[in-house]
């Protein structure tokens, strides 16, 4: 059967703000470890935004205290303020809005550095330093090349001969070594063409690439 190799783990990573890219630490094909730094944005504007929002939040907290004290509550213990009264006081003081803006600014700062979510290989990295980050598309993709799987189909009348765990041999059409694997998933649905989708885990030692066309033989 004809099949295609796909990575079991794949993550499209993107920046959440369009600041200028300051540093790129990796390139396509590099192997990275979970938690490894991939790229940074210029953080000057983000730092200013975070500092300003933090100041605004502190000011709103003081305003909130003034509102509650003005209503006769003790500044030493606001735990006795009724929930509805506290809700209205937070709106009047601008506390909730200031807190929301601070949390957003804090998140933007935390996401100004891209980190590898798992061990894998870098792919589809085309951005360059000193250019604004494009938030509408992925900055790069991390592929878990150790955990590859072959997606293929079999005829419905062949389904009775396939079981979970059955051995398979994967041969790339591009040539080279054949690799062994085992059936890991059988989709319990026959499509309009009388075909059933099957997946097989492949132990390729990093020698197969996602998207490769292969021939799959079930043993």
Regions from the PLM with identified roles:
Residues 39, 46, 50-53, 70, ...:
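Amphipathic alpha-helical coiled-coil segments and their boundaries
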Residues 1, 48, 52-63, 86-115:
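Extended amphipathic alpha-helical segments
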Residues 145, 164-180, 206:
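Low-complexity, intrinsically disordered
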Residues 45-46, 173-177, 219:
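Short, charged beta-turn/beta-strand-edge "cap" motif at the junction between a beta-strand
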């Amino acid at each position: 059967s004809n099949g295609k190799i796909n990575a079991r783990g794949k993550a499209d990573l993107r920046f959440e703000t369009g600041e200028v890219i300051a540093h790129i630490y990796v390139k396509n094909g590099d192997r990275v470890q979970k938690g490894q730094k991939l790229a940074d944005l210029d953080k000057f504007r983000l730092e200013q935004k975070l500092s300003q929002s933090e100041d605004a939040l502190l000011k709103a907290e003081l305003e909130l205290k003034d509102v509650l004290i003005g209503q006769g509550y003790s500044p030493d213990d606001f735990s006795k303020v009724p929930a509805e009264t506290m809700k209205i006081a937070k709106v009047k003081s601008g506390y909730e809005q200031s807190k929301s803006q601070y949390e957003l600014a804090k998140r933007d700062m935390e996401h100004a550095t891209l980190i590898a979510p798992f061990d894998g290989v870098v792919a589809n990295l085309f951005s360059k330093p000193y250019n604004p980050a494009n938030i509408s598309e992925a900055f790069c993709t991390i592929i878990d090349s150790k955990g590859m799987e072959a997606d293929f189909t079999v005829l419905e009348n062949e389904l009775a001969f396939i079981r979970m765990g059955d051995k398979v041999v994967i041969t790339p059409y591009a040539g080279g070594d054949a690799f062994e694997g085992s059936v890991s998933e059988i989709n319990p649905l026959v499509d309009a063409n009388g075909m059933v989708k099957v997946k097989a885990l492949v132990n390729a030692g990093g020698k197969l690439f996602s998207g490769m066309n292969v021939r799959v033989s079930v043993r």
